[in-house]
């Protein structure tokens, strides 16, 4: 809508017509997203959080809980709602009222809780891979990667991380750091875990050149090639001439130097 090559008056006319179409339950003129679900009751959330395992507290009195899904829970519904808000804010999101998937039912959820405003600040989804595979539960990352049997020692002592978010009103307030405090507390309770792994999403709003640089950098310094552990089901393909151009700037000789170069290149995009 915003990019239509027409004047403001014409845009207003089309937008008014779009709203009339919606009101009459007819096909809208513009593609729209599903409305995000209404917030859960704060009283019900507080009651449900009190039944979760408490594993930590931050200096500013945020509480860290571990939630295991059971039945129809306001916690899981609110996590799904806030995920959708956070991901839509960066041009992503499922397009649904809540962002939930089948894995949520048997993964654990690390939650940062604001006791004053009675709100979920953010969350991380955790998968204790040894326990999950013993129970024959599929890992989320198995939908993205092909693992070989040589990954077994890592699964036996591993924790899959993913689906992290912080709701926008708490951005810039150390919320992600606090979630990592919670991960540290979880690891302290499970000393067998030695390996953390999981997928990272690059937003489609990021310029392609920036994504190319990030993929090139991490393939250069942390490639899984030759390890015979894992391969991507949908590998990212760099432009044919990208290596020839990038290797003059990011050499692969010194990680710290290459990382500073990467940051400078990204800052100028």
Predicted regions, residues:
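Acyl-donor binding region in acyl/amide transferases
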Residues: 94, 130-269
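Short alpha-helical functional segments enriched in proximate histidine and acidic residues
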Residues: 22, 86-89, 186-190
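Short amphipathic alpha-helix that is part of the acyltransferase structural core
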Residues: 56-109
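Non-catalytic C-terminal accessory region of glycerolipid acyltransferases
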Residues: 1-37, 244-252, 266
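Beta-sheet entry/capping signal
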Residues: 79, 109, 119, 193-197
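Conserved N-terminal entry element of GNAT/NAT acetyltransferase domains
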Residues: 33-70
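Short catalytic/ligand-binding loop motif for oxyanion handling, primarily in non-cytosolic enzymes
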Residues: 2, 120, 204-208
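Conserved beta-strand in the GNAT
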Residues: 111, 119-127
């Amino acid at each position: 809508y915003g990019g239509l090559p027409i004047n403001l008056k014409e845009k207003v006319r089309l937008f008014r017509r779009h709203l009339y179409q919606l009101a009459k339950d007819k096909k809208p003129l513009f593609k729209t997203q599903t409305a995000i679900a209404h917030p859960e009751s704060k009283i019900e959330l507080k009651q449900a959080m009190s039944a979760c395992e408490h594993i930590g507290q931050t200096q500013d009195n945020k509480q860290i809980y571990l939630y295991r899904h059971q039945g129809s829970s306001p916690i899981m519904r609110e996590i799904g709602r806030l995920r959708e808000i956070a991901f839509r804010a960066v041009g992503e999101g499922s397009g649904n009222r809540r962002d939930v998937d089948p894995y949520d039912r048997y993964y654990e959820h690390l939650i940062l809780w604001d006791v004053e405003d009675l709100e979920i600040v953010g969350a991380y989804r955790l998968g204790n891979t040894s326990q999950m595979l013993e129970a024959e539960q599929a890992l989320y990352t198995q939908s993205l990667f092909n693992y070989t049997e040589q990954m077994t020692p890592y699964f036996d002592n591993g924790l899959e991380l993913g689906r992290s978010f912080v709701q926008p009103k708490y951005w810039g307030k150390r919320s992600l750091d606090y979630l990592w405090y919670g991960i540290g507390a979880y690891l302290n309770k499970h000393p067998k875990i030695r390996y953390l792994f999981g997928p990272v999403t690059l937003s489609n709003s990021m310029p392609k050149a920036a994504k190319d640089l990030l993929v090139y950098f991490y393939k250069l310094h942390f490639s899984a090639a030759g390890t015979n552990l894992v391969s991507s089901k949908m590998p990212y393909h760099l432009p044919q001439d990208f290596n020839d151009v990038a290797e003059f700037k990011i050499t692969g000789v010194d990680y710290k130097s290459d990382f500073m170069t990467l940051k400078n290149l990204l800052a100028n995009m």
